[in-house]
Amino acid sequence: MTEKKARPIKVVAENRKARFNYSIEDTFEAGVMLTGTEVKSARNGKSTISESYADSKNGEIWLVNANIPEYLQANRFNHEPRRPRKLLLHKRQINKLIGAIEREGMTLIPLKMYFNEQGRLKLELALAKGKKLHDKRETEKKRDWSREKSRLLRARG
């Protein structure tokens, strides 16, 4: 029998601003409940998660405002691009996330959406706290200083 080759991880969408706008406390991997046309459209790589967030409703975690565009080859069976999508997590993880959202005022933001080795669409979620303006400036100053240091060290030799 021939063995199936492991597929490489394919990143579909990434939220690059998340690490700048939020201080990330913890990360989780969650499955996403999708329809067939959503999976095919996500494989095309045109999805965006930059304006999306995760919210809790009735003891479940939902991905809100993520854009998976309509699949061009699907006609009347197409999906709604910005519909809420249920996230698949263990009950213990769901309880931990809901507790952090309600008690500590934290936010659930998606960091990246990718297909794993089995071909399943996964979402990397982060439990994060929003940064204030002065925090953002501080991280920008640190980044600029580290760039300047590396330039000086390269110039010296």
Swiss-Prot record:
GO biological process, one term: trans-translation
Protein location: Cytoplasm
InterPro entries in the record: SmpB, SsrA-bd_prot, SsrA-bd_prot_CS
Chain's role: Required for rescue of stalled ribosomes mediated by trans-translation. Binds to transfer-messenger RNA (tmRNA), required for stable association of tmRNA with ribosomes. tmRNA and SmpB together mimic tRNA shape, replacing the anticodon stem-loop with SmpB. tmRNA is encoded by the ssrA gene; the 2 termini fold to resemble tRNA(Ala) and it encodes a 'tag peptide', a short internal open reading frame. During trans-translation Ala-aminoacylated tmRNA acts like a tRNA, entering the A-site of stalled ribosomes, displacing the stalled mRNA.
Record's keyword annotation contains Cytoplasm: yes
PANTHER family, per the entry: SSRA-BINDING PROTEIN, TMRNA-BINDING COMPONENT OF TRANS-TRANSLATION TAGGING COMPLEX
UniProt cross-references to SUPFAM superfamilies, sorted A to Z: Small protein B (SmpB) (SSF74982)
Any one Pfam family match given in the protein's UniProt record, by short name: SmpB
Annotated stretches, region: Disordered: 133-157
GO molecular function: RNA binding
UniProt biased composition (Basic and acidic residues): 135-151
Assigned keywords, A-Z: Cytoplasm, RNA-binding
Gene name of the record: smpB
Name of the protein this chain belongs to: SsrA-binding protein
